UniProtKB/Swiss-Prot annotation:
One GO BP annotation of this record: mRNA pseudouridine synthesis
Protein's job: Responsible for synthesis of pseudouridine from uracil-55 in the psi GC loop of transfer RNAs. Osmoprotectant regulator of PLC.
Name of this protein: tRNA pseudouridine synthase B
InterPro entries (UniProt xref): PsdUridine_synth_cat_dom_sf, PsdUridine_synth_N, PUA-like_sf, PUA_sf, tRNA_psdUridine_synth_TruB, tRNA_sdUridine_synth_fam1_C, TruB_C
Location of the active site: 48
Matches recorded under HAMAP family: TruB_bact (MF_01080)
Assigned EC number: 5.4.99.25
Gene from which the chain derives: truB
Catalyzed reactions per annotation: uridine(55) in tRNA = pseudouridine(55) in tRNA
Amino acid sequence: MAQVKRIRRSISGILVLDKPRGMSSNQALQKVRWLLNAEKAGHTGSLDPLATGVLPLCFGEATKFSQYLLDADKGYETVMRMGITTTTGDAEGELLAERDVTVGRDDLEQALPRFRGDIEQVPPMYSALKKDGQPLYKLARAGEVVEREARSVTITRLDLLSFEPPCATLAVSCSKGTYVRTLVEDLGQVLGCGAHVAALRRTQAGPFALAQAITLETLERVHAEGGPEALDQFLMPEDSGLLHWPVLQLSEHSAYYWLHGQPVRAPEAPKFGWLRVQDHTGRFIGIGEVTDDGRIAPRRLIRS
């Protein structure tokens, strides 16, 4: 007997998942997509399988704005294990070297300031970055090491939360593209003992914080009790990741032309930059950019 194809739901919104350890970001996305029975889904930047915490998942029309969450600053808490270096820079890699740890709390506190602000990082070999079309982690698994250019990143917070040798817990706030594994490895090198990431928890992704994140266990329980529709309560509006942007409400007349791809004039709009755009009822209809001539050009539109 032929299996009946499951008809997926056309839903839109953002769900902030508290990703469990041991699951890739894509595995987590596909699991939640199945629970929601969603037609279209995407995540907003990978978390390593080792890592837990904030992973915003976009569904339906919200996927059009996932790039702007990829570009957002992130926050983490990480446990740094001093004295041991690994091939991957975290607890999942093979042991490279082991040293005695004679580092004191004051030593660590004194080393932190050099990693605050704008710094240069060399991305790790075990990363999704590509070299000649090949992901670096695939080359690393084949035993290859290739030259990687240093990249500029910004560390806005790097504080010591606890110190229990050989481990220390750090709070990190950073720009996009920052590798906490590399930060910990570089810090371990400065301390002279080496280090790797023993645990990593993302506490912030743009405007989304851990307090808003829903565990997979909660989603599974609610799904078991009420099916996919019961999970809609956890969906946030499509523009939830853009609430820090200025908002512009268009008249009914202007919104009509704007939604048909035409730039419009709005005297109350800012002189430059990107905007969240609403129609005359206050409904979010997309994002726009102020052009050189002062008009508001549509860049991403919500399908009604």
